[in-house]
Design a protein with these regions (language model features):
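Charged, terminal alpha-helix-loop-beta segments
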Residues: 1-167
Length: 167
């Protein structure tokens, strides 16, 4: 299921420093027409990071699959695996929570992870919505994540084993 995939993938990846692990995948494979995204990702130097699974908004109406609070950026993550969005405005609702509750003073990225064609379609349907003027919408396909694992900088046999297990 989606939750198992999210838990296993990010539960493992969080043991690698952000700058050598997840950010390598994002810098090489995340897609956005927003020109600021590449600049934001290339400027991140965080090592340790928290991954908050299934974080809920204060009113409980919005739940996102993952949230990563970094020093200068908040990254919301919506994972789709063989299922569409729960509603046409799901990403908008998540973006508003990023903007107003979780990281009002930081840059905000909302990362959609899905099958390549589905991710591209959902991105196109949402990218011009008003909230994405303040929240940077980005997508990443599961196919590219698999390729991106080759970009991870590993410093020990233990880290190599973790990445191999993810493949």
């Amino acid at each position: 299921s989606e939750d198992v995939l999210t838990g296993c993938f990010f539960g493992t990846l969080r043991y690698l420093p952000f700058s050598r692990g997840l950010n390598q995948i994002l810098k090489h494979y995340a897609v956005s027409e927003d020109t600021q995204v590449a600049h934001i990702l290339s400027g991140l130097s965080d090592e340790a990071f928290d991954f908050e699974f299934w974080k809920r908004s204060e009113n409980g109406n919005v739940e996102i699959d993952g949230y990563i609070p970094l020093a200068s950026v908040g990254i919301g993550i919506e994972v789709k695996y063989q299922s569409g969005l729960s509603g046409v405005n799901q990403l908008e609702k998540e973006a508003v929570v990023l903007k107003e509750e979780w990281c009002p003073e930081k840059e905000k990225l909302l990362l959609l992870i899905a099958d390549a064609e589905e991710a591209k379609q959902i991105y196109r349907e949402n990218k011009n919505k008003a909230v994405f003027q303040d929240v940077h919408l980005v997508y990443l396909s599961w196919q590219d994540i698999l390729l991106g694992l080759d970009q991870v900088v590993m410093m020990s046999p233990y880290e190599e084993k973790m990445v191999e297990d993810l493949k």
